[in-house]
């Protein structure tokens, strides 16, 4: 006879169940009872009064019938409102530039008890070793850190140079890991729609789990075909009717509000009582400065309530229960008997003011998390080592020749969006007919010795200086934008010297730089230190012109060939709408 009861993503022994049942019946002593608390009812609306009873990791009972129940410890909630722990439905922790350990320290006290992350940033640089490190971090975390197995490494075959592959055989080795919830975003949507066998093999292999999508702006028969293949959700929607159509066709909608891609205002009007079980919240990419100053999922909930008048129970529903159901995490997302005791106590539910957080039945202490961070990071055995196999460059590497009277393609940036427009500009002896055009280059950093791929960028707001980074989705080559070849070379050489990182150059000097020693993506500094360094970088960048709110995150997506319309990879200028390389000069 099997001596344990298994759920999809957690395991509880028969002995634990017997103890939990005894507390539920009132025959045994609870570990904790939370008194003076109201529970927000995410199913019916309104509130439930009465204590919350906890045994081990689980809730044993809820309601006034437990007012006199015995407990080893009682927590006085002082009239707080209790809600389930918040869940981020899709993110890349690497984009915070924090390690998973530091990320937990920064976000768990804000109520973020669960994350569904795709570590494809580090997998693109290091391959399976990067995924293995994330799994080690997830295993030791207090926060529920679940992993989607990265499906597109690189993002699009044959369009860029990256650091490693992640084969189906390697992916399958992680499929049954207890922290794995499914297959991460399938970015090659044209390949799926056309029925490429290699992609269908991946979908088939993970079909019993959750299949994440990625299809910005997709509609019509192509969207139908993509969903027919089994894709279940999308976090890339940026227009109201696009989101509505995906919901109508059975997709779940992840409403994203990151540091660069900000889609909440466009999509929040869709949320209602009927479709909220199919709506989730995610950040995708959010930097440590915003987390420290504005928050994480708590910030998104606050905006739904204050700016979009979403009812409390619906706002908290899409931040927890909806996501838990979607990913089969049936032990999460509700404050109910038998559920894991991931609880956020709010002194003000409308303002999402977090008073206390419990995860897996234990109160969280922010100072303890900070004190243990260094030791826990060391225990995870981070994959240190220089991943920048690139020699220093000179200004001549960025020299472009232009012919007066000719027209040249320009990548046009849309502030706070990941999509770009493809426009053009005419060159004359006095320069381009647009004064906002600057230069952009992408340099592969994995030892292939390719010449820099160079192009033109408009709308970014760079009036002087140069910015360079090794955070450049998804292959994470070196991306640099600038007004002069000399300053571009200086910025690139600084990030090479740092072993990866971010840099701002102005007036011929490095004004600010941030080394990222893990894969050229992440720092080992504390969240507070990292936020301060990001603040200094942003201040230096603002001196270069009216840039996007998050210039480095916006810049990081200019080389991603799966988001429209015109991008630059290490192999050249890529027309995303045609899924083909194109020329800098317009000849057609």
From Swiss-Prot:
<dbReference type="Pfam" id="PF01979">
    <property type="entry name" value="Amidohydro_1"/>
</dbReference>
<dbReference type="InterPro" id="IPR011059">
    <property type="entry name" value="Metal-dep_hydrolase_composite"/>
</dbReference>
<dbReference type="InterPro" id="IPR032466">
    <property type="entry name" value="Metal_Hydrolase"/>
</dbReference>
<comment type="subunit">
    <text>Homodimer.</text>
</comment>
<protein>
    <recommendedName>
        <fullName>Adenine deaminase</fullName>
        <ecNumber>3.5.4.2</ecNumber>
    </recommendedName>
</protein>
<dbReference type="InterPro" id="IPR006679">
    <property type="entry name" value="Adenine_deam"/>
</dbReference>
<dbReference type="InterPro" id="IPR026912">
    <property type="entry name" value="Adenine_deam_C"/>
</dbReference>
<dbReference type="GO" id="GO:0000034">
    <property type="term" value="F:adenine deaminase activity"/>
</dbReference>
<dbReference type="Pfam" id="PF13382">
    <property type="entry name" value="Adenine_deam_C"/>
</dbReference>
<comment type="similarity">
    <text>Belongs to the metallo-dependent hydrolases superfamily. Adenine deaminase family.</text>
</comment>
<keyword id="KW-0378">Hydrolase</keyword>
<dbReference type="GO" id="GO:0006146">
    <property type="term" value="P:adenine catabolic process"/>
</dbReference>
<keyword id="KW-0464">Manganese</keyword>
<dbReference type="InterPro" id="IPR006680">
    <property type="entry name" value="Amidohydro-rel"/>
</dbReference>
């Amino acid at each position: 006879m099997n001596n344990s009861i298994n759920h999809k993503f957690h395991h509880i022994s028969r002995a634990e169940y017997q103890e939990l049942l005894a507390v539920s019946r009132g025959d045994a002593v609870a570990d904790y009872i939370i008194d003076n608390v109201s529970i927000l009812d995410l199913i019916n609306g309104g509130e439930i009064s009465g204590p919350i009873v906890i045994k081990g990791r689980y809730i044993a009972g809820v309601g006034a019938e437990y007012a006199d129940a015995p407990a080893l410890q009682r927590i006085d909630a002082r009239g707080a409102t209790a809600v389930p722990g918040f869940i981020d439905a899709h993110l890349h922790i690497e984009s915070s530039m924090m390690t998973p350990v530091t990320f937990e320290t920064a976000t768990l006290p804000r109520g973020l008890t669960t994350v569904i992350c795709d570590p494809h940033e580090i997998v693109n640089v290091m391959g399976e070793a990067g995924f293995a490190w994330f799994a080690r971090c997830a295993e030791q975390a207090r926060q529920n850190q679940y992993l989607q197995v990265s499906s597109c490494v690189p993002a699009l075959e044959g369009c860029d140079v990256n650091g490693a592959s992640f084969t189906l055989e390697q992916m399958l080795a992680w499929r049954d890991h207890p922290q794995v919830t499914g297959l991460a975003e399938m970015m090659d949507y044209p390949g799926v729609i056309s029925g490429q066998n290699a992609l269908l093999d991946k979908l088939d292999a993970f079909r019993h789990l959750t299949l994440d999508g990625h299809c910005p702006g997709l509609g019509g028969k192509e969207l139908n075909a993509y969903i027919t293949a089994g894709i279940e959700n999308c976090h890339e929607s940026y227009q109201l009717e696009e989101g509505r159509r995906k919901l109508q066709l059975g997709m779940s909608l992840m409403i994203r509000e990151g540091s660069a891609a900000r889609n909440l205002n466009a999509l929040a009007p869709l949320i209602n009582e009927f479709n909220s079980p199919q709506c989730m919240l995610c950040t995708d990419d959010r930097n440590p400065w915003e987390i420290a100053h504005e928050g994480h999922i708590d910030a998104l909930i606050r905006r739904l309530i204050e700016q979009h008048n979403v009812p409390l129970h619906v706002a908290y529903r899409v931040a927890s229960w909806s996501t838990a159901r979607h990913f089969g995490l049936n032990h999460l997302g509700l404050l109910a008997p038998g559920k894991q005791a991931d609880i956020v106590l709010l002194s003000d539910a409308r303002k999402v003011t977090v008073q206390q957080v419990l995860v897996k039945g234990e109160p969280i202490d922010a100072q303890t998390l900070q004190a243990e961070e260094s030791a826990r990071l060391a225990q995870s055995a981070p994959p240190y080592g220089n991943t920048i196999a690139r020699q220093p460059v000179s200004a001549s590497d960025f020299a472009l020749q232009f012919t007066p009277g000719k027209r040249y393609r320009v990548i046009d940036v849309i502030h706070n969006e990941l999509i770009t427009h493809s426009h053009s500009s005419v060159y004359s002896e006095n320069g381009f007919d647009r004064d906002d055009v600057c230069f952009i280059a992408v340099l592969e950093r994995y030892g292939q010795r390719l010449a820099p791929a160079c192009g033109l960028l408009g709308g970014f707001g760079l009036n002087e200086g140069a910015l360079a980074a090794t955070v450049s989705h998804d292959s994470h080559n070196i991306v640099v934008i600038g007004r002069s070849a000399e300053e571009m070379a200086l910025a690139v050489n600084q990030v090479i010297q740092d072993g990866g990182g971010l840099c701002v150059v102005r007036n011929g000097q490095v004004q600010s730089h941030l080394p990222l020693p893990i894969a050229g993506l992440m720092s080992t500094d504390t969240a507070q230190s990292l936020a301060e360094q990001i603040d200094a970088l942003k201040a230096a960048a603002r001196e270069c012109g009216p840039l996007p709110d998050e210039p480095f995150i916006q810049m990081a997506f200019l080389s991603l060939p799966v988001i429209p319309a015109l991008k630059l990879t290490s192999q050249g200028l890529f027309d995303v709408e045609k899924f083909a390389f194109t020329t800098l000069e317009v000849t057609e």
